[in-house]
Curated annotation (Swiss-Prot):
Substrate binds at D13, S14, Y45, G46, N77, T78, T188, H189. This is Glutamate racemase. Provides the (R)-glutamate required for cell wall biosynthesis. Belongs to the aspartate/glutamate racemases family. It catalyses: L-glutamate = D-glutamate. It comes from the Bacteria. It is an enzyme of class 5 (isomerase). One of its GO terms (molecular function) is glutamate racemase activity. It holds the Pfam family Asp_Glu_race. Keywords: Cell shape, Cell wall biogenesis/degradation, Isomerase, Peptidoglycan synthesis. It comes from Roseiflexus sp. (strain RS-1). GO terms for biological process: cell wall organization; peptidoglycan biosynthetic process; regulation of cell shape.
Length: 272
């Protein structure tokens, strides 16, 4: 154990979505202190340019590191695709873990040979997803489906609304019609819609989320680097901060039954 072990693991996303990753990290590492930043003032990220995303991600990471983060999880597929390499260059002393859409397990587990990927427009425009597809999905038909509007609906907590269901049905039905038996969730917000997705796609469709693998990678790094918090029975604290409205964010966390001890206001400055 090092002196850094009590410092928090930091995570950030444009909003509530990255809390699905925090939930998995908490499950694997219940003794760790967690610090989560929701940049709701700039949500959604999915239509922003790569330059914008790199500047925003750098500011979010700097905020977490200034508050003692010993490791930072980029709990957002869009920001990971645009900014992960840049963050590692900017902050070489801090380990970063990013989101990679689980195309590899999807390609190995599909029975029909058709896989659908649900993601934001910016994630689909980036190189990361295409690199993963070309490397791991040879011989598999991968259909990329942009899902504008879903993040905004989730941020409103409108998971079961007619508008959300209409959007989701419009995005998923073409994948099913094309023969997809496996759906990759390429945005950390989308696991919050798994029950709704299951209602459309049916129980036989495999739905894959990257969060468990990311949590495993976080656990591996803190163990290998001697950063594991030395606790036996005490649970770590979970602090959440938002650049938006803290009261509204706290209510959303509660409605979605996500783990959090307290919610704070955050102010970050984006370098031009």
């Amino acid at each position: 154990m090092s002196d850094q072990s009590a410092r928090p693991i930091g995570l950030f996303d444009s909003g509530i979505g990255g809390m699905t990753v925090l939930r998995e990290v908490r499950r694997l590492l219940p003794g760790e202190n967690l610090l989560y930043l929701a940049d709701q003032a700039r949500c959604p990220y999915g239509s922003r340019s790569p330059d914008e995303l790199r500047a925003i991600a750098a500011a979010c990471a700097a905020w977490l590191i200034a508050r003692g983060a010993k490791l930072v999880v980029v709990a957002c597929n869009t920001a990971s695709a645009a900014a992960l390499a840049d963050l590692r260059r900017r902050f070489p002393a801090i380990p970063f873990v990013g989101m990679v859409p689980p195309v590899k397990p999807a390609a190995s587990r599909t029975r029909s040979g058709v896989v659908g990927v649900l993601a934001t427009p910016a994630t689909l425009a980036g190189d990361l997803l295409h690199d993963v597809i070309s490397r791991w999905a040879e011989g598999v038909h991968v259909i990329e489906q942009a899902c504008p509007g879903l993040v905004e609906q989730i941020e409103e907590g409108a998971l079961d609304s007619p508008e959300t269901m209409a959007l989701l049905r419009g995005y998923v039905t073409p994948l099913l019609d094309a023969g997809a038996d496996t759906i990759v969730l390429g945005c950390t917000h989308y696991p919050l819609l798994v029950p709704q997705l299951r209602a459309i796609a049916g129980d036989d469709t495999l739905i894959l989320d990257a969060a468990p693998a990311v949590a495993q990678r976080v656990a591996q790094i803190v163990q290998e680097r001697g950063l594991m918090r030395n606790v036996n029975t005490l649970s770590g604290a979970i602090t959440c901060a938002t650049t938006g409205d803290p009261e509204r964010f706290a209510n959303l966390i509660h409605r979605l039954d996500l783990p959090c001890d307290r919610v704070e206001q955050a102010v970050i400055t984006i370098d031009a």
